């Protein structure tokens, strides 16, 4: 089964966030990652408001590949850039 990674993002530093997104895409590609969606939140359909500004959805061939990428030596240095650029809530789903 494939897996989705969904990141809900509140931007702190747009330049750092862009650096993170660019580098992460390159690092995730060897693990079979495919960008499904990246964009601004339009509106909340339920509740008072969305608790984030942006959303990113990435598809992986499996949860194992997603976990392999997230734990990879290549990804670890990007976490510092991620945390400087944004507050993120990242979740995974098997589909």
Sequence positions of predicted segments:
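Short S/T/G/P-rich N-terminal loop/turn motif that feeds into the first structured element of a domain
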Residues: 1-73, 92-95
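Short, conserved catalytic or adaptor-binding loops enriched in Gly and charged residues
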Residues: 26-27, 81-83
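Short, compact, well-ordered microdomains
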Residues: 73-80
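C-terminal end-helix/capping segment
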Residues: 83-95
């Amino acid at each position: 089964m494939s897996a989705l990674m969904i990141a809900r993002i509140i931007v702190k530093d747009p330049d750092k966030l862009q650096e993170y997104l660019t580098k992460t895409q390159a690092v995730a590609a060897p693990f079979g990652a495919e960008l499904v969606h990246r964009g601004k939140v339009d509106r909340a359909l339920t509740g008072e408001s969305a608790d984030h500004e942006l959303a990113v959805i990435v598809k992986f061939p499996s949860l194992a590949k997603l976990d392999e990428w997230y734990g990879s030596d290549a990804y670890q240095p990007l976490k510092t850039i991620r945390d400087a650029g944004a507050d993120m809530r990242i979740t995974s789903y098997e589909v």
